[in-house]
Amino acid sequence: MHSNLGLAGLAGLLATASVCLSAPADQNITSDTYCYGQSPPVYPSPEGSGTGSWAAAYAKAKNFVAQLTPEEKVNLTAGTDANNGCSGNIAAIPRLNFPGLCVSDAGNGLRGTDYVSSWPSGLHVGASWSKALAKQRAIHMAKEFRKKGVNVILGPVVGPLGRVAEAGRNWEGFSNDPYLSGALVYETVDGAQSVGVATCTKHYILNEQETNRNPGTEDGVDIAAVSSNIDDKTMHELYLWPFQDAVLAGSASIMCSYNRVNNSYGCQNSKTLNGLLKTELGFQGYVMTDWGAQHAGIAGANAGLDMVMPSTETWGANLTTAISNGTMDASRLDDMAIRIIASWYQMNQNSDSPSPGVGMPTNMYAPHQRVIGREASSKQTLLRGAIEGHVLVKNTNSALPLKSPQLLSVFGYDAKGPDALKQNFNWLSYSPAIQENHTLWVGGGSGANNAAYVDAPIDAIKRQAYEDGTSVLYDLSSEDPDVDPTTDACLVFINSYATEGWDRPGLADKSSDSLVKNVAGKCANTIVTIHNAGIRVIGDWIDHENVTAVIFAHLPGQDSGRALVELLYGRANPSGKLPYTVAKKAEDYGSLLHPSLPETPYGLFPQSDFDEGVYIDYRAFDKANITPQFEFGFGLSYTAFEYSGLRISNPKKSPQYPPSAAIQQGGNPHLWDKTVTVSAEVKNTGRVAGAEVAQLYIGIPNGPVRQLRGFEKVDVSAGETTQVKFALNRRDLSTWDVEAQQWSLQRGTYRVYVGRSSRDLPLTGSFTL
């Protein structure tokens, strides 16, 4: 890493979250010069090394780029218009048989086209806690992208991580925990790219709110994008962590975000791009802007930006001019082009790939070629994925599974299907608290997807009723419906919506809560299903004696109803666990409930100070000793599991810092050295088979009480016992040393906790380093 700051000066800047200095307290500053220097400069931009599995792709790319004219190199670095419906395009170079690139939304399935599937969302996969599911979903989903001529998936999402409870895009990512997010993004990147489609992991980095995410104008006054101000320790231990796992898995591209980081825009921040991503993590692919996130010309290129989407007004011929006048090295343009072409070769897209955009019509309602993306082989993964992301959080007196009901009463707006499915479904110009006209199976914005169909809960319930001879009464519009007193169960469906572009107006809504309470006041067996695009607090009615069962159904995709009925009737056993903490009341999230808003003196340059450090979600609840409604990692089953036999291996003797080594993709390879192995036994003590997520938490000296550092989802037959093992590597047991700029093992006693959730940990032990 090269910088014009010495190590001591660098560490000083990074030790605490950055803020603008010496600003007047009583009036808005009108220049961001107060904020200069808060993000350390790191230059030059390192060239891709072609390390490890990238060697062959880099050799081919260098040969390819050597044949390009300056104009052709420049054209690779910015999007262009094309006669297709791709989100973005890179122009072809016909004389060298390069067909161009089609990049398209998004990480939860293709958007804006036909003959594709609506997959379970990232949050839904996070709630499954299944690495195997994450990989299979990625494989089958990527096959649809490939058949439709998409070279690059604009996903998966690990930013936002979920710092702000009301953040509008938390549903696109996997979890509020970096370890869980990192494990699932690794499988997602690995799975998608195994079928020859590149991933663009996003949004890098600290894109933790939608409010003021972009610069804007209010009453004719320019307002900058919000600045996420963070210290180096928190950056590494929380927000960079899952991106490191994505790079380790070989993500071909990283999308830089709209926001500023320590008062430097994310797509021209040399510290995050040159320093962290390309130097420390050894990233071999290319950095792509989010749409319209370019705010600088040559400065952005020098800071590590490689590709602008969807087009550029500041690069083009200006890049070659900059090389001519010496403000940019020719090697930087070469590296940009090499990284892009190397990723194309790395995905083997030079061989037998569909034409870019072949199945992406500009208008689905105009004549176009039929290109089928869906495959019959995906059906099992679609349904399994939909099932496993449901989390059962209450089940009084075994209300579920249903037992041959004679009469079911169904209530709530969320039970019914949509009136229409369109090309850009669920892109709204505002963010309502709920989708009151139909069931919620996906969130809004660019992360939405196109469904082949939507199996709504009421439709699936009717099909099952036909098979069983059950009567079904329903009222899907009233807030205070009539209830037949002889009904076996009342099924109430509500939702909680979220979308790109807006943060949520709250974590609950009065009309939905009133519906639940009104039904529960008349029905002794009220079962509530919530399709939630993020945290939903339910303290208003969760303790009602007639609310017997509650399911967080998240965003299951097109097989929503079918999956739910499998669970309601016991043909599938709930196995999901919460990937976030549900508070008893919204105020328990404290300062991390709402997004940061512009305040004097920074009204024109909004600031969001990450002063809480690593203490978000369950770490914050543990630190403040707040009892949640349902803790991180919690989820019920139709059976029960018993834990025993904790074993901890003797730790491998290791120096405080990892030995020096050539940086590979993912960083210093010694970070992955195995240090300790923990094992335990899980017994199914119930009468039916089920799947349990065994969770390992570590208490690192001088750190939070507990941090997730392992999980395994295991299927266990009734009465059977299985062993789970957790292999802990050096990074798992380290904290970030801001002075040494290294991951550091701590000297002292490490606490070990194994169990069902972050607060139900029957097995405890320790080891010493």
From Swiss-Prot:
GO biological process, one term: cellulose catabolic process
Pathway where this protein functions: Glycan metabolism; cellulose degradation
Record: glycosylation sites: 28, 75, 262, 318, 325, 437, 546
Record-linked Pfam families: Fn3-like (PF14310), Glyco_hydro_3 (PF00933), Glyco_hydro_3_C (PF01915)
InterPro entries found in the cross-reference section: Cellulose_deg_GH3, Fn3-like, Glyco_hydro_3_C, Glyco_hydro_3_C_sf, Glyco_hydro_3_N, Glyco_hydro_3_N_sf, Glycoside_hydrolase_SF, Ig-like_fold
Presence of keyword Glycoprotein: yes
Localization (cell): Secreted
Keywords: Carbohydrate metabolism, Cellulose degradation, Glycoprotein, Glycosidase, Hydrolase, Polysaccharide degradation, Secreted, Signal
Enzyme active site: 290
Catalytic activity: Hydrolysis of terminal, non-reducing beta-D-glucosyl residues with release of beta-D-glucose
Gene Ontology cellular component list: extracellular region
Organism superkingdom: Eukaryota
GO terms of molecular function: beta-glucosidase activity
Signal sequence bounds: 1-22
SUPFAM superfamilies named among the record's database cross-references: (Trans)glycosidases (SSF51445), Beta-D-glucan exohydrolase, C-terminal domain (SSF52279)
EC number: 3.2.1.21
Function recorded in the entry: Beta-glucosidases are one of a number of cellulolytic enzymes involved in the degradation of cellulosic biomass. Catalyzes the last step releasing glucose from the inhibitory cellobiose.
Family to which the UniProt record says this protein belongs: Belongs to the glycosyl hydrolase 3 family.
Protein's recorded name: Probable beta-glucosidase M
Organism (species): Neosartorya fischeri (strain ATCC 1020 / DSM 3700 / CBS 544.65 / FGSC A1164 / JCM 1740 / NRRL 181 / WB 181) (Aspergillus fischerianus)
Gene name, Swiss-Prot/TrEMBL: bglM
